[in-house]
Design a protein with these regions (language model features):
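N-terminal [4Fe-4S]-dependent radical SAM core
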Residues: 1-37
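Canonical Radical SAM [4Fe-4S] cluster-binding loop centered on the CxxxCxxC motif
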Residues: 30-71
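Local cysteine-cluster metal-coordination motifs and their immediate loop/turn environment
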Residues: 43-54, 330-333, 369-389
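Radical SAM/AdoMet-radical enzyme domain recognition
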Residues: 73, 77-92, 101-250
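Short Fe-S-cluster ligation motifs
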Residues: 75-94, 361-364, 399-409
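C-terminal accessory region of radical SAM enzymes
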Residues: 247-258, 263-302, 333-377
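Short, small/polar residue-rich loop motifs at catalytic or cofactor-binding pockets
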Residues: 313-316
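Short, acidic, Ser/Thr-enriched surface-loop or helix-capping motifs
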Residues: 323
Length: 409
């Protein structure tokens, strides 16, 4: 029988290993990748309790915060357009809080995109924001330039304001709710991004129905908050595996005084409860009306289509992070010196994304799965979720089990 050809087992090329095989990941004809740009670095006007990015400003050897210089911005816009071979290029602007740079920065972005776009090429922009700085001028610009806005909101007032507060510990719900209504008034396309954490995971339907009915969101994204204790200075995969708790150990729970994760991390079982309740509601009432990222991708995978989210894909690595100073990292959850790929002032984005080092990073998602995962009936649905969340050992003692495993099952 012929060996199975899959994403983690590509066809052989004489003289090349799979990490450098140009026809698989790096072929010029197939150079499609995504860059998450952080033009203000970790700078933000909020102080959300669970934010993993604020600490980058003091990370030794890290990117800090700042304002992307004009030369770096133009280099990025031109290089990204030149490096991607598809007819569509999507620029994603995140943070920190990118609107801190002001409307003028993004007017400059659009001007540069028009300057460097190839004939017939479609340029799209999306902007992830906490919404607190948006006003009518912003909304008119976003509408005119066809930006897709991602609005961060965690649910009803009492849930949202538990974690998403200002530097002076003031609530932000009213500002974010007003931003949603203003975007609707101006006809700006937007979706919602909701973090699932220790303080809202027990109220899935309150969160979902609020987003659906009060905010009017028709594209809802949920992301779990999972952070290992000491994440501020410890890059994923650099921890002592011998000290990781085994599945079922009390230290797997965020309430335990010696928990492997921070107190605000979602508990695995609660995350499973949260998703199950939302799946039931979505399936019964909202299929075809509301897009829920984790529900949609599960349906797609069961139809034989690839996952729509990186964490449930067999391989990753085609989504890198660009910092304000031009440094490029393997992923926005891997913005640590150990995962710095280079700087766009010296290297092209394409060369960094399709370098053997980054390709190995992408393949490691499936290649490093423990045997417990490889024989799991849900492997093709999960693929070990995000590698940065592999904080447990299996019942056999093998490291590499995802913290959310029990909940995802």
């Amino acid at each position: 029988a012929k060996p199975l050809v899959s994403a983690s087992n590509p066809p052989a090329t004489p003289g090349l290993d799979k990490y450098s095989a140009p026809h698989w990941l790096g072929a010029r004809a197939n150079r499609r990748f995504h860059v998450m740009a952080k033009p203000a670095g970790s700078a933000c006007n909020l102080d959300c309790a669970y934010c993993f990015y604020l600490s980058k400003r003091v990370l030794p050897g890290g990117p800090g915060s700042g304002h992307m210089p004009d030369d770096v911005l133009e280099r990025f816009v031109k290089d990204y357009i030149d490096s991607v071979t598809s007819d569509e290029v999507v620029f994603s602007w995140q943070g920190g809080e990118p609107t801190l740079l002001g409307l003028e920065f993004f007017e400059k972005v659009v001007t540069l995109q028009k300057k460097h776009a190839r004939a017939g090429q479609r340029i799209e922009n999306d902007l992830q924001t906490n919404g607190t700085l948006l006003d009518d001028d912003w909304a008119r610009f976003l509408k005119q330039q066809r930006f897709l806005v991602g609005l961060s909101i965690d649910g009803p007032r009492e849930i949202h304001d538990h974690c998403r507060i200002t530097k002076h510990a003031e609530p932000t719900f009213d500002q974010v709710f007003a931003a949603a209504k203003m975007l609707q008034k101006h006809g700006v396309r937007f979706n919602t991004l909701t973090c699932v954490h220790r303080y809202n995971a027990s109220r899935p339907l309150d969160v979902y129905r609020f987003l659906r009915r009060e905010i009017g969101s028709t594209y809802i994204q949920f992301i779990p908050i999972v952070e290992i204790r000491g994440f501020e200075n410890m890059a994923p995969g650099t921890w002592d595996e011998a000290k990781l708790p085994m599945l079922g150990d009390p230290r797997c729970h965020p309430d335990h005084p010696e928990s492997v994760v921070t107190p605000w991390s979602v508990a695995a079982e609660e995350y499973g409860y949260f998703l199950s309740k939302i799946w039931d509601e979505w399936q019964a009432r909202d299929v075809g009306k509301v897009l829920v990222n984790l529900c949609e991708t599960l349906v797609a995978q069961h139809m034989g289509l690839p996952s729509q989210v990186c964490v449930h894909s067999e391989i990753c690595g085609k989504g890198v992070a660009l910092e304000h100073d031009g440094d490029v990292y393997s992923c926005d959850h891997y913005v640590y010196p150990e995962y710095r790929l280079g700087n766009i002032r010296q290297q092209s984005l394409g060369d960094m994304v399709f370098s053997p080092r980054q390709v190995k990073f992408g393949y490691a998602k499936s290649e490093t799965l423990p045997a417990y995962c490889r024989r799991c009936e849900f492997l093709s649905d999960c693929w070990g979720e995000c590698p940065k969340n592999r904080l447990l050992r299996t019942p056999d003692g093998e490291p590499g089990l995802n913290y959310l495993c029990a909940g995802l099952k």
